[in-house]
C-alpha cells in the first residue's frame, strides 16, 4: 500500500517554506579588547620600528667603515714599500753630499756626468714617490714639532727663537696625512723665546 499523500505533502512544505519570511540573524559585536591590549600593540610596533632604525644605522656605519678602509688601503698600502725606497733615496743624497762643491766645479766631464746621473736618478725616485702619495718635507726655519720631526741635537743660535729648526740632518716624508718618516733635525738653543700666538688683536699684557 502506497502513501498517496507523499508528493502533496512535499509540495505543501515547499510552498510554506517559500511563504515564510527570511529573518536575518542579529550581528553580534565582538568582545571589547582586554585592557592594555592596544598599548601592547603600540609598544610592539614602536620596538619593531626602533629595531629597524638601529639596523639601518648599523648598515650605514658599516658602509662608511668599509669605504674608509678601502680608501686607506689605497692611500697607505704602499707604506712599507715606500719606506724601503726611502733608503735608496737617502743613499743617493749621501753620494751627492759626499762630493764637495769645489770638487764639482773642477770635476772633469766624466765625474760631472756621473753626478748629473745620480741627481737625475734621485729626482726620478722622488717623483715616483710623489705619484703614489708620498711627499718630501723640509722643516728648516720652522718651529720644532715633535709630531713631524725628531730632534737629534741642540744648536746654540741666538739669532733665531729657541726651538727653531736650524739644521735638517735627514728630510722627512709624509704619506697622505700621516708621517711616513719624521725629519731628523737640529734645534736652536738659547735664542729669544718664540713670540706668543695672537689673540684676535687683544693685548693680554698686564
UniProtKB/Swiss-Prot annotation:
A single Gene Ontology CC term: cytoplasm
General function of this protein: Participates actively in the response to hyperosmotic and heat shock by preventing the aggregation of stress-denatured proteins, in association with DnaK and GrpE. It is the nucleotide exchange factor for DnaK and may function as a thermosensor. Unfolded proteins bind initially to DnaJ; upon interaction with the DnaJ-bound protein, DnaK hydrolyzes its bound ATP, resulting in the formation of a stable complex. GrpE releases ADP from DnaK; ATP binding to DnaK triggers the release of the substrate protein, thus completing the reaction cycle.
Name of the protein in its database record: Protein GrpE
Localization in the cell: Cytoplasm
Domain of life (superkingdom): Bacteria
Keyword Chaperone annotated: yes
Chief place of localization: cytoplasm
Annotated segments matching region Disordered: 1-36
Matches recorded under PANTHER family: GRPE PROTEIN, GRPE PROTEIN HOMOLOG, MITOCHONDRIAL
Keywords from the UniProt entry: Chaperone, Cytoplasm, Stress response
GO molecular function: adenyl-nucleotide exchange factor activity; protein homodimerization activity; protein-folding chaperone binding; unfolded protein binding
